[in-house]
Amino acid sequence: MVAAGGCAGSGADKGSAAGSAAVAGDDIRGAKLTFVGDDAFAPYRYLETQSDGKQKVVGLDIAIADEMASRLGFSYDFEPQDFAATLASVQSDDKAFTMAMSSNEEREQTYDFTRGYYQPLVGVLTLGGDPVKRVEDLAGKSIACTTGTVQNKFIAKVMPDADIHTYDGGDQCLQEVLAGRIDAYLCDGAEGQSMRDANEGLVLGLLDRSETSDHVGVYRLMAKKGDGFVAALDECIGEMLEDGTIDDCIKQYVGADFMWNGDYSASGTSTAAGK
């Protein structure tokens, strides 16, 4: 995949942004990277049928990665993998990265992260009934999570005695709920929004950030610890936040309720050396 322009509707001045990011991106210019990740993680990454009948991976993460590639002069291929395989691939390949990852002390021993580009909400998908909007409303329910995700770790921490079932991917969790074998799928809120819209009868509740913010951080780009290109990508993300490009992408792929709207205080900083 070769980089294309930014999100539709962006009014940002791409010329000045590209010039400033290029200074930090000298080491990445001309590089060929690999973006690994789940391609069934809408609205971040998902397959869309094109006019020629072929399928193409699109979504928020792809749009942001394309724009970074355009500004910094690198290219990348997307390689679909489930969550567990993604972590191993990034750890073993100094040209690989993934996105929609939260940082924590354990992960920071092995990986470097950019600042955050997106603030997630935790969603709860159920088949019918009232939307689950509080953690206490999950009491007595069987809960599905994708193995190793922040949602998985969050619920295991706050409800250690809950009936938690883990699966390799979000699609498996969804099918368990649709089949009535599991009561609730604890997921990324925007992912849950896409799944609800595509499946009649699903109900989505969003947990308040006051209950989740200590456990579920901003989404970042993640690469192997010590990879030199992380600093350039981090600076580029900072510029894209400031010039409104990322909010344009969020509005297009997720919705206006999830935009930063000028307050980037929660985006944090990069974990890369020297940042």
Model-predicted segments: where are they?
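Bilobed "Venus flytrap"/periplasmic-binding protein-like clamshell domains
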Residues: 35, 39-42, 54-71, 102-105, ...
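C-terminal motif of bacterial Sec signal peptides marking the signal peptidase cleavage site
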Residues: 2-6
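Extracytoplasmic small-molecule ligand-binding "clamshell" domains
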Residues: 15-101
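Extended ligand-binding regions for polar small-molecule ligands
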Residues: 8, 62-71, 149, 216-257
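A ligand-binding cleft/hinge motif common to bilobed small-molecule-binding domains
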Residues: 84-88, 101-110, 154-157, 183-215
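Acidic, polar ligand-binding/catalytic clefts
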Residues: 62, 70, 75-137, 210-211
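Periplasmic-binding protein-like
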Residues: 39, 118-126, 197-237, 256-275
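Ligand-binding clefts/hinges and TM-proximal coupling segments of bilobed small-molecule sensing domains
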Residues: 9-10, 15, 153-168, 204-208, ...
